[in-house]
Amino acid sequence: MITNGQIQKVPVRELTVGRIMRMREVAANYYREPDSGLSDELRCGNLVYFIEDDDGAIGCFLIVDFDHHRTTLNDRYYRFTYLGLGCATSSSIVPVFRKVKSDFSQQLAKGTVGVLHLTTRTPFAYHGIERAYGSDIFPTGRDHEPPESIQIVKYIREAIHHQPLVSDRDNPFLLREVKKGPFNPQEIARIGTFRGDTPIAKMGVRCDGRDEVIVFHTFVV
């Protein structure tokens, strides 16, 4: 029997049909079209982290592209992990975020900068990353972001998301017209109850729109 609250990880290629269906049930709490969104994310990721209850129900899951990208910027070596679709019902996803970072850090050589990044249009996702990692989370929402974070986000949007900046006035953290899967009305209403100040709101990103914000956390081994 699986211990309630235990974080597990499975390669995407080894997911059973039954487990995928249970992931779909969780995603349906958020999205109007959970099947297409889940299929797209599973094609992009290579690992799924999840917490499964004793009765087999999935309390939360996170699809991850573990070794997403590598590059050298200003003589520093960077490795990127992409945090894809994450949904939670009966379990907090925060411990899963922390487990991904722990596993990722064990693969990094000394001096490597690890970057865990995602794109989002909901303040709850940003808040979850804040709770999981505490510091070195970008964008900060301040008027002036650190130069290194600007360099990293420009690389992420151009090399990974293939959306280069059109002008110097563009916000490098803001991706235009990228999201396909709409939230369901219940989730839109829930997001509307969020009380807090995040860069998502400051950038004018709406949960019922298609713009998203690049969010990332950096750390050095």
Cite the ranges covered by each PLM segment.
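Conserved acetyl-CoA-binding loop-helix of GNAT-fold acetyltransferases
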Residues: 88-106
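Short linear motifs at secondary-structure transitions and domain/linker junctions
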Residues: 21-29, 38, 54-62, 91-95, ...
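Alpha-helix termini
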Residues: 71, 104-112
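A generic structural signal for ordered secondary structure
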Residues: 48, 58, 99, 103, ...
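Terminal substrate-recognition subdomain of acyl/acetyltransferases
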Residues: 1-15, 39-45, 109-221
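A conserved beta-strand-loop-helix scaffold within acyl/acetyltransferase catalytic domains
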Residues: 7-87
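Polar/charged side chains located within well-ordered beta-strands of beta-rich proteins
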Residues: 81-83, 101, 217
